[in-house]
């Protein structure tokens, strides 16, 4: 784009690519982080094998492939458009989203199992910080002089609520994360599962009630474990391998 044409677009929207059809693919956090580490260049490839059989492979050395679950964008689905902005602030309409895709994760793949184990280890490792204090900074007691006491007012401020809201994942994706967590440990508390799945507490508890038992007494008090029907199902998958 020439400088003359670019200057004319400042404050306006370039619609040259308005008719382009664009795909919108929702990816999990670990995949997004992997792409960010790659930096510039190719981050993956889309493989169209016919019909709805579409997959995504990423990273030159990873060699992992994900199936894509597609949803056609219709007038009933609020239509979305893609915009871009260059360093000079010029806006451009890059196209319309014609297809929405969600990644279907193979929870039985070795790569995904290794990822879940590393996340589980990370969230269950307590870190402590050691700080060296200079002796000159230590408290030195002084004589108390009541005449030098100054009266001041104290205000109480309400603690700001965290704005870092966790994004709700679809139930099937959360279930995959829950089953993966219980492959590493048979009993887990809510805090660990909440950190592991990165889901809002109430949303997670609703799903846990469907597949888990919360022990209310005994040595596993306040710990979750899979219900027998899901535990046996998960074990049978491992035995087939």
Swiss-Prot record:
<dbReference type="GO" id="GO:0005674">
    <property type="term" value="C:transcription factor TFIIF complex"/>
</dbReference>
<dbReference type="InterPro" id="IPR040504">
    <property type="entry name" value="TFIIF_beta_N"/>
</dbReference>
<dbReference type="InterPro" id="IPR040450">
    <property type="entry name" value="TFIIF_beta_HTH"/>
</dbReference>
<dbReference type="Pfam" id="PF17683">
    <property type="entry name" value="TFIIF_beta_N"/>
</dbReference>
<comment type="similarity">
    <text>Belongs to the TFIIF beta subunit family.</text>
</comment>
<dbReference type="InterPro" id="IPR036388">
    <property type="entry name" value="WH-like_DNA-bd_sf"/>
</dbReference>
<dbReference type="GO" id="GO:0006366">
    <property type="term" value="P:transcription by RNA polymerase II"/>
</dbReference>
<keyword id="KW-0238">DNA-binding</keyword>
<comment type="subunit">
    <text>Heterodimer of an alpha and a beta subunit.</text>
</comment>
<keyword id="KW-0539">Nucleus</keyword>
<protein>
    <recommendedName>
        <fullName>General transcription factor IIF subunit 2</fullName>
    </recommendedName>
</protein>
<dbReference type="InterPro" id="IPR003196">
    <property type="entry name" value="TFIIF_beta"/>
</dbReference>
<comment type="function">
    <text>TFIIF is a general transcription initiation factor that binds to RNA polymerase II and helps to recruit it to the initiation complex in collaboration with TFIIB.</text>
</comment>
<dbReference type="GO" id="GO:0003677">
    <property type="term" value="F:DNA binding"/>
</dbReference>
<keyword id="KW-0805">Transcription regulation</keyword>
<dbReference type="GO" id="GO:0006367">
    <property type="term" value="P:transcription initiation at RNA polymerase II promoter"/>
</dbReference>
<keyword id="KW-0804">Transcription</keyword>
<dbReference type="InterPro" id="IPR036390">
    <property type="entry name" value="WH_DNA-bd_sf"/>
</dbReference>
<dbReference type="Pfam" id="PF02270">
    <property type="entry name" value="TFIIF_beta"/>
</dbReference>
<dbReference type="InterPro" id="IPR011039">
    <property type="entry name" value="TFIIF_interaction"/>
</dbReference>
